[in-house]
Regions:
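N-terminal Rossmann-like NAD(P) cofactor-binding subdomain of oxidoreductases
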Residues: 1-183
Length: 183
């Protein structure tokens, strides 16, 4: 029996995706959706325990399988987005694409999702039929969570920041290497 929206999850085993899965479990989100787990490297393998009707991993490159989802949440990275997203939209899929990668951030129909900072923008886009929801740069998002109100009040003109994005974007092994260098 289907429960809620069919939500495809891609990139759920990586650094960003595994944190998302932990958060979704803790908040009971899997009770409200019908999750389908996709993989770029292990299609046909066993899906995680949160799977309901689909107990096997689907191929993350299979456009027909992806089209069955009302929502796709991907933490797989920009190369995946660039390879799959245009084909999926060209196939006529009208579902919601939620993406942690930067690949679509500058598209005209993309909405950066950081609800504590821009909830009115998100709500307006949703009311207009928006369906491309893109995560912001992690460093900038964290910064805006802390100082966004100061920007809105005109008390901050600009800010400069540094990041280890190149390492985190490379995955868990690169982060371990970086942390080992710190001692």
């Amino acid at each position: 029996m289907k429960i809620g929206n069919v939500v495809g999850l891609v990139g759920w085993r990586g650094m960003v995706g595994s944190v998302l899965m932990d958060r979704m479990r803790a908040e009971g989100d899997f009770d409200l959706i019908e999750p389908i787990f996709f993989s770029t490297s292990n299609a046909g393998g066993n899906a995680p325990a949160m799977a309901k009707n689909e107990k096997k991993l689907k191929d993350a490159g299979d456009i027909d399988a992806l089209k069955q989802c009302d929502v796709i949440i991907t933490c797989q990275g920009g190369d995946y987005t660039n390879a799959v997203f245009p084909k999926l939209r060209a196939s006529g899929w009208k579902g919601h694409w939620i993406d942690a990668a930067s690949a679509l951030r500058m598209q005209n129909d993309a909405v950066i999702i950081l609800d504590p900072v821009n909830m009115p923008v998100i709500e307006n886009a949703l009311a207009r039929g928006g369906n491309n929801w893109i995560g912001g740069n992690c460093t900038v998002s964290c910064m805006l969570m802390g100082v966004g109100a100061l920007f809105k009040a005109g008390l901050v003109e600009w800010m400069s920041t540094q990041t280890y994005q190149a390492a985190s974007g490379g995955g868990a092994q690169h982060m371990r290497e970086l942390l080992a260098q710190f001692g």
